[in-house]
């Protein structure tokens, strides 16, 4: 399948499927250690490398911790909620019980000053 990041389309096998933007909120899982900063949680390097890969793939548009770091918010481009859940389930922190999907909402990004 050929992904066309930023163009809202994905082409594969002669079919075209529309891509959409979503606001994805990730929350701490049951194995999160509240006594340790985010970068000192077990598996930080593996998690960070995984997330960097999602950015490089064009899946994550932007994201990071919000407020006190209890949650993260990401703008993602995907075909739908199933794709989002499937891809995020591959995060080493998901399988380790450190992070889980809190919510997924379709998001119309009308303003984008990144150029």
Regions found by a protein language model. Name each.
Residues 11-115:
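Conserved, structured core segments of small domains
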């Amino acid at each position: 399948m050929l992904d066309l990041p930023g163009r809202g389309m994905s082409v594969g096998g002669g079919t075209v499927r529309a891509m959409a933007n979503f606001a994805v909120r990730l929350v701490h899982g049951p194995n999160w250690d509240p006594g340790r900063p985010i970068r000192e949680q077990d598996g930080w390097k593996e998690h960070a490398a995984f997330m960097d890969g999602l950015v490089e793939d064009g899946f994550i548009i932007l994201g990071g911790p919000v407020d006190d770091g209890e949650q993260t918010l990401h703008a993602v481009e995907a075909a739908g909620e199933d794709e989002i859940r499937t891809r995020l389930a591959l995060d080493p922190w998901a399988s380790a019980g450190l992070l889980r999907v809190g919510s997924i909402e379709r998001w119309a990004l009308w303003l984008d000053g990144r150029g």
